[in-house]
C-alpha cells in the first residue's frame, strides 16, 4: 500500500459540490460518494478535518444583494454550513467513520463548540472533524475558514475539492475552449492574476503560513485519495 504524502489534511468542500447536478440542496448520491472517499483516506491513518460551504442552501452575498443586512445574511449562510456538516457527519457515521462536528457559533444541542485543542485531540484519535459555521464572523468566507483552521491545527495541506472544474485555469474552461490548466502556481500568482482559486483573505493566510493547496475535482471517485498520496492531479498552489 502506498504511503500518504500528507498526515493531516483539511478537505474544503463547496456547498455546490454536495448539490451535484441538481444545483440546490443535498444530493444523497453525491454526499455518499464524498463520505466514501473520506473513508478511503481515513483508513490510510490520515487525520482528516473538513470544512463545508453552504452555497447549495444559502449565500450571504445574495442576501445582501436582495437588500438584507450583510451580517444577518452571512449568519444565515453559517447556519447552512451546519446543515451540510450534519448531513456529512451522518453519511460518514453510516459507513463506520467516527465523526465530530464543531461549530464556531455555539449550538450545544447540535454539535460541539470549536475548541482547537479538542479538535486536535479528536484528529489524533483518528476521528474526522467537521468545522461548521465558518469562522463565526460575517464577511469571512468558508475558504478563509479552511485556511484559518488549517493554520490552527497545523495541517500539512488544504485539499480544495471542486465539483465543476479539475484545477485552476487561465480562463473559464466552460466558456473558453482554449483555456489552459496550471499544474503549479504560487499564491502571489493567484493574487496578482485574480485567479478564482479562493478569495484574497484566504490566499494571503495560506501564503503567510506556508500551507500548500491542491485544487481538484471531487466528482471523479478516488481523487481525494490520489491527492493525499501525492499523485499529480489538479493544480498545486504554494509559496510566494
UniProtKB/Swiss-Prot annotation:
InterPro entries: AceGlu_kinase-like_sf, Asp/Glu/Uridylate_kinase, Uridylate_kinase, Uridylate_kinase_bac. Keywords: Allosteric enzyme, ATP-binding, Cytoplasm, Kinase, Nucleotide-binding, Pyrimidine biosynthesis, Transferase. It comes from the Bacteria. GO terms for cellular component: cytoplasm. GO terms for molecular function: ATP binding; UMP kinase activity. UMP binds at residues 54, 74, 135-142. It holds the Pfam family AA_kinase. Pathway: Pyrimidine metabolism; CTP biosynthesis via de novo pathway; UDP from UMP (UMPK route): step 1/1. GO terms for biological process: 'de novo' CTP biosynthetic process; UDP biosynthetic process. ATP binds at residues 12-15, 55, 59, 163, 169, 172. Homohexamer. PANTHER family: URIDYLATE KINASE, URIDYLATE KINASE PUMPKIN, CHLOROPLASTIC. Belongs to the UMP kinase family. This is Uridylate kinase. It comes from Bacillus cereus (strain ATCC 14579 / DSM 31 / CCUG 7414 / JCM 2152 / NBRC 15305 / NCIMB 9373 / NCTC 2599 / NRRL B-3711).
Amino acid at each position: 500500500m502506498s504511503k500518504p504524502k500528507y498526515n493531516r489534511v483539511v478537505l474544503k468542500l463547496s456547498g455546490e459540490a454536495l448539490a451535484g447536478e441538481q444545483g440546490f440542496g443535498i444530493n444523497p448520491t453525491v454526499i455518499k460518494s464524498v463520505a466514501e472517499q473520506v473513508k478511503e483516506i481515513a483508513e490510510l491513518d490520515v487525520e482528516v478535518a473538513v470544512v463545508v460551504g453552504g452555497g447549495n442552501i444559502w449565500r450571504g452575498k445574495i442576501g445582501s444583494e436582495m437588500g438584507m443586512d450583510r451580517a444577518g445574511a452571512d449568519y444565515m449562510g453559517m447556519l447552512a454550513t451546519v446543515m451540510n456538516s450534519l448531513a456529512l457527519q451522518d453519511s460518514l457515521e453510516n459507513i463506520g467513520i467516527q465523526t465530530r462536528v464543531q461549530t464556531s457559533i455555539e449550538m450545544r444541542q447540535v454539535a460541539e463548540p470549536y475548541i482547537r485543542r479538542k479538535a486536535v485531540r479528536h484528529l489524533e484519535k483518528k476521528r474526522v472533524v467537521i468545522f461548521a459555521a465558518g469562522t463565526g464572523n460575517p464577511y469571512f468566507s468558508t475558504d478563509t475558514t479552511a485556511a484559518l483552521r488549517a493554520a490552527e491545527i497545523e495541517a500539512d495541506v488544504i485539499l480544495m475539492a471542486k465539483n465543476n472544474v479539475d484545477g485552476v485555469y487561465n480562463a473559464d474552461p466552460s466558456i473558453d475552449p482554449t483555456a489552459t490548466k496550471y499544474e503549479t502556481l504560487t499564491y502571489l500568482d493567484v493574487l496578482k492574476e485574480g485567479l478564482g482559486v479562493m478569495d484574497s483573505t484566504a490566499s494571503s493566510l495560506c501564503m503567510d503560513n506556508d500551507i500548500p493547496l491542491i485544487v481538484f475535482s471531487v466528482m471523479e471517485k478516488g481523487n481525494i485519495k490520489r491527492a493525499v498520496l501525492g499523485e499529480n492531479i489538479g493544480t498545486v498552489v504554494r509559496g510566494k
